Amino acid sequence: MESRGKILMERYELGRLLGKGTFGKVHYARNLESNQSVAIKMMDKQQVLKVGLSEQIRREITTMRLVAHKNIVQLHEVMATRNKIYFVMEYVKGGELFEKVAKRGKLTEVVAHKYFQQLISAVDYCHSRGVYHRDLKPENLLLDENENLKVSDFGLSALSESKRQDGLLHTTCGTPAYVAPEVISKIGYDGAKSDIWSCGVILFVLVAGYLPFQGPNLMEMYRKIQHGEFRCPGWFSRKLQKLLYKIMDPNPSTRISIQKIKESTWFRKGPEENRILKERTLNENTTKNVALVLGVRRKKNAHEDVKPMSVTNLNAFEIISFSKGFDLSGMFIVKEWRNEARFTSDKSASTIISKLEDVAKALNLRVRKKDNGVVKMQGRKEGRNGVLQFDIEIFEVTTSYHIIEMKQTSGDSLEYRQLLEEGIRPALKDIVLAWHGDE
């Protein structure tokens, strides 16, 4: 793209590359008139239109203009040419808070307390303006030259006007490890409550050096999030533990509010000095945990060693193998299986099973159960590339909420997609809450 030293719009001299993502790059730049250092986010117009990001960009601009707070990265101006869109933003010199955690392994409660107070101040301000961030995580928290926190990246933010008539937001946004259980359920959620949950996960990560909710795969992590299953390590002060359990309450209606957080003893007074331990050198286990916080993924099959949901009649699940696109984390996780599909259902296990059996019969598919409890479904005739075959697993998040995952294991991919789109998806519409990957 633009090389170092290039003059942009006769106003900015472009410098080094600060970072890049799927849809753009961020460069350091200098205002030629004021000599002020800025960061310029550059996006290709055609690519934005092609992938349907125009609404998200409009929202980001609107949001950033609504918020002006010392702990929020400021948007100075937006410029455009025929081919490019340029966001001129405050340049934050200190880098990501995320990098600090990765380098040290964890922070003391005293340091984490300072950052958490600044985070809550910024989030509370946003909420007072009807703005919800929806993607709060350490990577979106920057530090200035004075070690003060700055919240960035409003690309997923939602305005209060985006709510439906029920007063709730309905878009699944955010990064899996930091997302609230009600967001996962995709049944509508209060943006303020979901941001509070994410703040709690961030606080835990800062002091622990690892994520509160972990599992061998995404489904198990989601299950733990839904049930609020986490434990605080021994070096957490008692008051911090008490606050975290109130913040990461899986029930949004009883979850602590920002006002109550600000009134809590730990938030107002900080940790007890005699409870604070010195930061330790990263050991092998902590390094592994930090890798999880950083989002480093194992190359191993994401479903390896998963204990399947114990449903009486797993045969029913075989029929699910024909769906496409339900990935609750479709925005964030790169799928390791090309022909994998997931969907959610709010029906009971018995209803799902019955429906799957009906669909299998209608589509002339053979259903059989494997020894490890995974259901295998296959065609009765050999296709262009052998017999079409699928593995199916059902994961119980709650008794009335299930995630069904399907994976093609053999046969022709084109035949699989055709069967999925023309046969399976239409046949399962009565039990599907959402195909993940669909808008």
Swiss-Prot record:
Its EC number is 2.7.11.1. Residues 12-267 form the Protein kinase domain. It holds the Pfam family NAF. ATP binds at residues 18-26, 41. Its cofactor is Mn(2+). PROSITE patterns: NAF, PROTEIN_KINASE_ATP, PROTEIN_KINASE_DOM, PROTEIN_KINASE_ST. The active site is at residue 135. GO terms for molecular function: ATP binding; protein serine kinase activity; protein serine/threonine kinase activity. Residues 153-182 are annotated as: Activation loop. Residues 298-333 form the NAF domain. GO terms for biological process: signal transduction. Keywords: ATP-binding, Kinase, Manganese, Nucleotide-binding, Serine/threonine-protein kinase, Transferase. It is an enzyme of class 2 (transferase). Residues 338-367 are annotated as: PPI. It catalyses: L-seryl-[protein] + ATP = O-phospho-L-seryl-[protein] + ADP + H(+); L-threonyl-[protein] + ATP = O-phospho-L-threonyl-[protein] + ADP + H(+). The activation loop within the kinase domain is the target of phosphorylation/activation by upstream protein kinases. The PPI motif mediates the interaction with the ABI (abscisic acid-insensitive) phosphatases. Belongs to the protein kinase superfamily. CAMK Ser/Thr protein kinase family. SNF1 subfamily. CIPK serine-threonine protein kinases interact with CBL proteins. Binding of a CBL protein to the regulatory NAF domain of CIPK protein lead to the activation of the kinase in a calcium-dependent manner. This is CBL-interacting protein kinase 14. The gene is CIPK14.
